[in-house]
């Protein structure tokens, strides 16, 4: 999605605010009314846990964004999307099992990640001197395609996995519905709110654009250490893969999910190497975390759900990073060094913000009484942190020239 479409879209919305606000309120009421007419598809206790996680993430966002209004917007939009998904599930007559509730965790993290990338870009453009309406258009231009691709890969991956494992069918429905409503909110609800309600002005910081590059330069002072880390990481990854294969109940859904996501990225990006890097980066983080997690406790078998849920979440940040990487690669500054520099300076901070918020939210869910939710939340938390380290520090440090 390039060109002027985002500016035209924002102008159309700005000239039709009353009609759009009416349509938004009617749509929200229709979706949410399912909760009152048909009843909630999940238990009240699970809803309280998820809402508590959202509240904690929004509280932390006040500090990370230096903006009370931005944190409030995150909470309101994420909650509206979540209630909209529950309402639609109620209208469809879907009653979620305890395993399927994990899909709601995926939806919440997906929505939060999408909003963080969109709002971080808005604040960055405003700090560079843009009026908020122009900043919204520029943010949509930069993030609409990565967010769409992120939602599609997550939905497509769960759908393919569900084809081979029937217990994932409900999860695929929930994730698909959440991804659809999430994207509609990104391109309609959020711009509509930002066209009617102004955020605080935030002065940009040096670390927003150059913080990660400075850390990478420090890592490059020890080239032998970096080379040793490459071989050590590859060795650990190989050992971890062999170790996990002994306990996995079925690897077919996982393998097909990975292949489906890679094919989708390849079709959109037209670059099989970058697509493969995005998939392998996410997979490596999850495999290493799962090995460490299950090596310290007794385990007889591991369900594919424990691997698929974090993979659907961790892959999102990889898509955002490599979308910017590919944007530079297809332009004039197309060397690996310049591509990493552009990706780090443009999307490094939003990825780090997303990682911190998701870590806090997943930590709350890590105390959930249900074993499935607790286990998947903790594994996803650790995998998110490790994936961010690989994407933002390790990979650039290895490929950038000193």
Which residues are covered by each model-predicted region?
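Membrane-embedded transmembrane helical bundles of large multi-pass transporters/channels
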Residues: 1-245, 250-402
